[in-house]
Amino acid sequence: LKSDMIRDGKVLTIPTKGTQSKSTTKTEYIPIELQPSLFSNDYISETPLDKIAIVPNQEIEDFALNGLVLENDNSGVIYHSIGVNGAKASDYNKFRLFNEQLPVLNPDLVIISLGTNESFDKQSGEQYFANLDQMIQGIKEKNPLACVLVMTSPPSVLHRKYKNTFIERYAELIEDNAQVKNYAVWNLLDVFGGNKSIKRNSAKGYMSRDKVHYSKAGYEKQGELFFEAFLQSYELFKSTKQ
């Protein structure tokens, strides 16, 4: 103590040479038999598991764990996402593991939302769509039963002050080629009012100060609008099947 002031709520610690025993527990890991494939390993448990442990193989020096997917037999939607800051369609085309590992998820629908980063590189519409088309074809080649939906870029400005005509051209090409290339389209640029609505969207609190990225409310609004459009299309699909 440096003074005789002891205030309410404080803890006084007195050093002592005494010791206190602590109980320890030993965990035993039971290896599971994996079903290997070229780019993944699967394990199906007959009973529900509440925990698993990942233990490195001591016999292998170099290895990579690219992902872990936990599933059950309950009905519902299984949603996966991949988002890399600054990513463009050309980036996904560079790394073959993206297409090689995607079948592990057995996707029914793959949604692609790219374009804003390409616009800051000032990619021409033709260059952008060539890269996008390569990405789509790579996905379909490895996942022939999966549907592909391309989402256009939301409204944005270039370098805080210029009209982003690049994403407008990208949206045109995405819509014009949808039927020929056999993919679905959701025009977020149009649904969000186009580039002329940037001031209005910003006033609503949907956009960040750079007028490129969106706020939490803005991204949630995009998700809400997409979900409504998706369900509406699904209900229309069901009605035509009856």
What residues fall within each predicted segment?
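Catalytic His-Asp segment of secreted/periplasmic serine-dependent ester chemistry enzymes
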Residues: 155-242
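Conserved SGNH/GDSL esterase-like catalytic core that processes O-acyl groups on lipids
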Residues: 1-130, 213
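A generic secondary-structure signal
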Residues: 100-101, 138, 229
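Residue-level detector of functional hotspots within protein domains
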Residues: 38-40, 96, 134, 169-171, ...
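Conserved N-terminal glycine/acidic-rich loop preference
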Residues: 106-119, 126-142, 147-190, 219
